[in-house]
Amino acid sequence: MGWMKDETGLDKNAANFVPLTPLSHLRRAALVYPEYEAVVYGDTRLSYAEYYRRCTRLASGLLAQGIASGDVVATLLPNIPAHAEAHFGVPACGAVLNTINTRLEPDTVAYIFDHGEARAVLVDTTLLGLVKAAIELMQGPAPIIVEVPDEQAGFPASGDHMTYDDLLAAGDPGYEWAMPQDEWESLALNYTSGTTGRPKGVVCHHRGAYLMTMGTAVSWEMSRHPRYLTIVPLFHCNNWNHTWMMPMLGGTVICCRDITAGAIYDAIADEGVTHFGGAPIVLNMIVNAEDADRRDFNHVVNVFTAGAPPPAATLAAIEPLGFSVMQVYGLTETYGHVTECLWHEKWDSETDESRYALKARTGVPMPMAEDITSMNAEDMSQVPKDATTQGEIMIRGNTVMKGYYKNPQATAEAFAGGYFHSGDIAVQHPDHYVQITDRAKDIIISGGENISSVEVEGVLMKHPDVLLCAVVAKPDDKWGEVPCACVELKPGAKADEAELIAFAREQLAGFKRPKKVLFQELPKTSTGKIQKFELRKVAKDL
């Protein structure tokens, strides 16, 4: 190892070792860029000095409500300034941030509240009904509700709860942030769908988030003062860590509450947006925008897209409009994207067909990832880099989660062999680029959001006419994938597609509902296991 013979007196100390945390970025930005725009939302424009003060008041206000170090503070918010502030203000008081998908149903939100033991929740006025319904289903104590109204969007405070402004007003602007004493301390708790049907709590540490911000800035070739549009939900992998990254560069976070083609074009033309991330559905939205929604702009907009390989036709249509698109890949367990389909100039002369095929590959490790490769999950051997032999994508590095909260068995399984097992099946090309060929564990990725097929199956199996059910992904031009339910009815049963979809609608969030129902005898193995790979073939041809 790299130790010299005599290292007496060369120990770590307060002068030469400081725990890495993305909180440092905003503290520095408040000093270095105090007058630069930090956050923009319609008529709201916050300088870095103001942004830092508001985050400080949030941290102090939470402490005044009894929030202690290590407590979980949840959010159910759209992409608005309060959500960006929560990314700094919550951990600045030592608490752990739990951003919750706003599209979930009450039962799942209740489970997340209970499992994470949320002490408080910052909730958009439009989502108060969801939170109250979830609290009714909880087993444990309810979180403190802090209502976040949005008068700019037409949603004033209900008057029934403490408001976000009340919380900030009670905070001390002179409060000293509680910076982590150990960079392994928990920063965020994010829930991800799994094949068990219940979401798993992914715990992220300060070190990983800090390194994500550094590596992303390098991969995106960012210079100072980028203008970043929040299309990726701030609840999704903490906005891929981009909100934590922007203060490092003195950049501007431009909040987008409602994602529409018109809103995107307006932000680019009026606010000079230089970067954004989004699923391929966002690219399709831009390409297929109505003429009335389109705006002219004279600069290149850099885009990270993830969730599915961008279709060649979409790339061919969007690039001439002024967008430079790179596919990235990652998971909640890896803080977001950890691979990039890095472009090489030698490919510029390739045919369009070849270029788009190259751009559809999953890519190579980003700078903050130690190793990402395709391996045989049985013996952890590297698969041949022949673009044909399939293996599982394995990931190792400092931007891999601490583990699954309160689930040591799942954590041990995920880290077996010294790598994180992604569950995604891929080949590896001779130039080391990985390319996903299939999704393992039956997760359906629709519009960038994960759907547990087991959860959907569990709901449909409650219908009195259903004997067996299997849910698989059906390719979809708009969403990438949508749930397709393959159902075997009980003898004499007469339920039809409309009835089953309506039944599912009563119990599932909109994006989880089956968009197609097929009635057939389900293929099974000799032991009675449903052969989903056969059903995927059927769904693919629909």
Predicted regions and their residues:
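Conserved AMP-binding/adenylate-forming core of the ANL superfamily
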Residues: 14, 18, 35-80, 84-88, ...
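Conserved structural elements of the adenylate-forming
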Residues: 52-60, 169-174, 188, 202-224, ...
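Structural core segment of the AMP-binding/adenylate-forming
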Residues: 64-65, 92-169, 491-493, 506
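AMP-binding/adenylate-forming catalytic core of the ANL superfamily
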Residues: 75, 104, 121-123, 276, ...
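Gly/Ser/Thr-rich phosphate-binding loop
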Residues: 165, 248, 273-278, 287-357, ...
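Conserved AMP-binding/adenylation subdomain of ANL enzymes
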Residues: 210-227, 235-275, 288-289
